[in-house]
C-alpha cells in the first residue's frame, strides 16, 4: 500500500479481538483461589492485572458431582452474546472393549431425514436381536415452520433474519442432541461392542424438493456426539461406505 498508493489497499491495523481467546494456562493466567472463585490475568487499564471471578455455585456442584474422577484442564475464555464465559475441559482415560468377532454385538445406525434414526442390533451371525426407531415429529414440524418463516421473510425482501435463523438452528441442534442420546441409550441397553454408521458425503449442491432439509441435516454432528458418548462407555465406532 506504500509502494503503490494508486491501487486499492489500506494500512494494516491490529487484529480485532474475537469471541474465543487462548487457553488460560494454570499458574500463569489462571489460579484457583477457592472452591467457588478463581483469578484470571487479563489486560485491563492498559496493564496486565489479576481479576477475581466468582463461579456459579450450581456449575461448581455439577462439576464436583459428574467430573470428580476426571482431570481438569486449563479453561478457555469465550464470549457469547454480550457476556463472557469460562469454559472448562476435562480429560478422561477409557479403555475400549476388546471382544472376539464371534461374540461381538454390533449396533447399525441409519440416520434419515424423515425419521431421526433406525437402530438395529445384530450378532456375529447376522441375527437381528433388537430394532429401535426414533421419530421426532414435533421437532420436525417446528423446524419446518421456522424454515417457512425464513423463506417468507426473504421473499418479502429481508436480507438478514438473525432471530429467525437462531430459532431454526436451535431446533436443529435439539434434534441432533436427542438423536445422539437415543443412539447411545440403545447401545447401552443391548451392551453392544461396536457402533456402525454410514460415511456420509454431504458436500456439493443439494437438489430436489427436500434440498433445504438436506442442507440443514446435521448428520455429521450427530455422528460426532455419538462417537464421544460411545468412547466414554468403551464402545468402538466404525464407518462404512
Language-model segment annotations:
Residues 82-241:
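Positively charged, helix-rich recognition surfaces that bind polyanionic ligands
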Residues 1-80:
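Acidic carboxylate diad motif detector
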Amino acid at each position: 500500500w506504500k509502494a503503490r498508493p494508486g491501487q486499492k489497499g489500506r494500512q494494516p491495523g491490529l487484529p480485532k479481538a474475537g469471541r474465543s481467546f487462548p487457553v488460560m494456562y494454570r499458574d500463569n493466567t489462571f489460579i484457583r483461589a477457592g472452591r467457588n472463585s478463581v483469578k484470571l490475568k487479563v489486560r485491563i487499564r492498559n496493564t496486565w492485572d489479576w481479576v477475581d471471578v466468582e463461579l456459579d455455585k450450581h456449575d461448581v456442584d455439577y462439576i464436583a458431582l459428574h467430573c470428580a474422577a476426571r482431570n481438569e484442564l486449563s479453561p478457555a475464555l469465550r464470549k457469547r452474546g454480550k457476556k463472557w464465559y469460562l469454559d472448562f475441559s476435562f480429560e478422561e482415560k477409557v479403555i475400549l472393549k476388546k471382544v472376539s468377532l464371534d461374540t461381538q454385538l454390533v449396533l447399525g445406525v441409519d440416520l434419515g431425514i424423515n425419521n431421526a434414526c433406525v437402530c438395529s442390533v445384530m450378532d456375529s451371525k447376522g441375527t437381528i436381536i433388537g430394532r429401535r426407531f426414533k421419530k421426532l415429529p414435533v421437532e420436525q414440524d417446528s423446524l419446518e415452520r421456522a424454515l417457512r418463516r425464513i423463506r417468507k421473510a426473504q421473499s418479502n425482501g429481508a436480507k438478514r433474519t438473525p432471530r429467525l435463523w437462531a430459532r431454526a438452528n436451535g431446533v436443529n441442534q435439539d434434534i441432533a442432541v436427542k438423536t445422539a442420546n437415543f443412539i447411545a441409550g440403545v447401545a447401552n441397553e443391548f451392551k453392544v461392542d461396536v457402533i456402525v454408521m454410514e460415511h456420509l458425503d454431504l458436500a456439493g449442491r443439494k437438489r430436489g424438493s427436500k434440498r433445504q432439509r438436506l442442507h440443514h441435516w446435521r448428520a455429521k454432528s450427530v455422528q460426532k456426539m455419538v462417537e464421544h458418548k460411545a468412547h466414554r462407555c468403551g464402545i468402538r465406532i466404525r464407518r462404512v461406505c
